[in-house]
Structure formats: structure tokens, C-alpha cells
Amino acid sequence: WNYGAKAARTAFAEIAEAIAAYEQVYLFVRPQDKASAQELLSSDRIHLIEAPTEDAWARDTGATFVVNDQGGRRGIQWEFNAWGGQYDGLYSHFEHDREVPERICNFLGDSFYNARPFVLEGGSIHVDGEGTLLTTEECLLSPGRNPSLTRAEIEEKLRQYLSVEKIIWLPFGIYNDETNGHIDNMCCFVKPGEVLLAW
């Protein structure tokens, strides 16, 4: 980030404050950045979790949460390899990012499933809450994710951990996306049976 990430931090703070008007917000901050984060944030609905990370995109590095029929919540800790590992990952040191799911679950007091070594980022899937999942072949079938698994085996993992019944595979994500075609920047459910699509 240029200039000590000042503009980015201000933008993150504005987004967090806007969301906090409606929802609780949890932000990871490096220990050395906590004081400056506190200066930018005023809502008591924003909670800072002190932890080192290599990347700011918690949707990808963080836990995926599932809720059972009784309302109990649990996280899922996928394997994270910086969007492709040795094959075409974006960076080689991601040890702290791998710890993000466990850290957030511990902070919230939630238990979690350990789905490792299955590689998945949160932005590579989108669900409707009623058993349907969207993803792309470009991403989940990428040689940098789970090269030893077949498409059917990947689908079984998704069904096992997310309790989905229907998996819709789009062939590609947005052209030249550095995440190998994540679904979250091109297609998402707004309600069951209805999607928004970047065109």
C-alpha cells in the first residue's frame, strides 16, 4: 500500500462505520496498527481483533460460517494458499493468513470444522441459504487449489461442509482475475433463485 496505507485505512474505516450502523463488524488489525485504527473508528459495534495478517481480504482468508436448524453457528477452516500456492499463488508467505479462521472463531467463541487440506477461499463460492451454491470451474478446478481431487470429489466436500444440494458451475470468472475466477466479483445471490451478474 502506498503512503503507509493512509487512504486505504480511511476507506476501510468509512466502510466499517457504514456497516456498523446495521451489523456488528469485526476487523483484524496488526498489533502495531491498533491505536491508529481506534482513532479512525468510533462505533461500539466495531470490534478489533489483534492479529498479524498478510492480506486484507478476510472474505477469502477467514472462516466460512454455517448455521444448523437450531440456530447454532460454527466456522469452517479451509486451507488457504494465497490463491494458488506454488502453482500460481500471489505470495509465498501466508502463515498468518492461514490462522485467520481459527482466530475469528476463538474471538467469537465459536467452534469450527477443520476442513484442511481442502483449499478454498470464501470468495470462490456463493450460497443462497437454501441449498444452492455458485462457483466457477476456473477457480475450484484450478491446478493451484486441489489438483488431486476430481470435480465430483470437490462437490462432495462442498456438500459435506456446507450442506448444499445443488452446485452451479460457471466456466469462468471475470477475465484476468488474480484469484483464478472467483465467483464473488461476478455473480451473487440476492435471494434464492435470483442473482446479480457483472456483465
Residue ranges and their predicted role:
Residues 1-199:
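The feature marks the mature, well-folded catalytic cores of soluble enzymes
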